[in-house]
From Swiss-Prot:
The gene is OR4C5. Glycans are attached at N29. Odorant receptor. Disulfide bonds join C118-C210. It is a multi-pass membrane protein. This is Olfactory receptor 4C5. Belongs to the G-protein coupled receptor 1 family. Keywords: Cell membrane, Disulfide bond, G-protein coupled receptor, Glycoprotein, Membrane, Olfaction, Receptor, Sensory transduction, Transducer, Transmembrane, Transmembrane helix. It comes from Homo sapiens (Human). GO terms for molecular function: G protein-coupled receptor activity; olfactory receptor activity. Residues 71-78, 142-160, 241-248, 303-326 are cytoplasmic. GO terms for cellular component: plasma membrane.
Length: 326
């Protein structure tokens, strides 16, 4: 809730970034935010509830199958599958931080989220997003070594290196999310508290702050949008160079490029721009928070014979094991 007689100008003159808990409480009178959600149409909400519940179920099942298959199959012991299992794990975690709340809100009349819950959601969203960005770079490097320098692949991508690269992804994602959250958490919010979105995101929150946030908007565009554009360009260029040197790698690179495009293009559309919001932002956010985590495991396993054979073997062991037990 927010205090209607709050004077934003007085607060802004007093302090922009509070340094103590007392100052923070004085400038922040909002304890919760109201989310307008995807739509106000009751029939559309019921339809979206069914669709998103199915998508979330498929996302969790698909990614869980990939993680279990890779971790239990000796045939999938190479670094590329180690990174793929980790990527599927992150996809499942990322989807679980957004989808359940969004699905639940489709059935509730008043969609609210506490201030601390909003900051937590913002942090987790950008944490997993940052981890996935770094992991996509790692997977591109792994693809380059495997295709262009196959004789040195197992030496270059040994267990220690793979573990270090994954640890770097975790640390990089944490630092990215921490910067984004600290950018928002100390801003003064004194009303209104209505977010025209289904999640807490940077630009909608910046618009609600009762201080000038144009500089912060530029920082977000640079830290998220420009960085995504730069990494996206590097990844696409890398895969093109791999294809130029090894045309036989077309199918492998095509799947990697598809995942990169599905991940980065929506992020670039949302963050690489001035601090303004559009109605289409919700649809774009739905795509990269709900749909993309479901598509990624399908794309990576669609024509991967080794993964499909390992899945068949796993299911055979499960079925025959159950029959033997019976």
């Amino acid at each position: 809730m927010y205090v209607s007689n709050c004077n934003p100008c007085a607060i802004h003159r007093k302090i922009n970034y509070p340094n103590t808990k007392l100052d923070f409480e004085q400038v922040n009178n909002i304890t919760e935010f109201i989310l307008l959600g995807l739509t106000q149409n009751a029939e559309a909400q019921k339809l979206l509830f069914a669709v998103f519940t199915l998508i979330y179920f498929l996302t969790m099942v698909d990614n869980l199958i990939i993680v279990v298959t890779i971790t239990t199959s000796p045939a999938l012991d190479s670094p590329v599958y180690f990174f793929l299992s980790f990527f599927s794990f992150i996809d499942g975690c990322s989807s679980s931080t957004m989808a359940p709340k969004m699905i639940f809100d489709l059935l509730t009349e008043k969609k609210t989220i506490s201030f601390s819950g909003c900051m937590t959601q913002l942090f987790v969203e950008h944490f997993f997003g940052g981890v996935e960005i770094i992991l996509l770079v790692v997977m591109a490097y792994d693809c380059y070594v495997a295709i262009c320098k196959p004789l040195y692949y197992l030496i270059t991508m040994n267990r220690q290196v793979c573990g270090l690269l994954v640890a770097m992804a975790w640390v990089g994602g944490f630092l990215h999310a921490l910067i984004q959250m600290l950018l928002i958490v100390w801003l003064p919010f004194c009303g209104p508290n209505v977010i025209d979105h289904f999640i807490c995101d940077l630009f909608p929150l910046l618009k609600l702050s009762c201080t000038d946030t144009h500089v912060f908007g530029l920082f977000v565009a640079a830290n998220s949008g420009l960085m995504c554009m730069l990494i996206f360009s590097i990844l696409i260029t890398s895969y093109v160079l791999i294809l130029c040197s090894q045309r036989k790698a077309l199918s492998t690179c095509a799947f990697h490029i598809t995942v990169v495009v599905l991940f980065f293009v929506p992020c670039i559309l949302v963050y690489l721009r001035p601090m303004i919001t559009f109605p289409i932002d919700k649809a774009v956010s739905v795509f990269y928070t709900v749909v993309t985590p479901m598509l990624n495991p399908l794309i990576y396993t669609l024509r991967n014979t080794e993964v499909k054979n390992a899945m068949k073997q796993l299911w055979s062991q499960i079925i025959w094991g159950n029959n033997l037990c019976d």
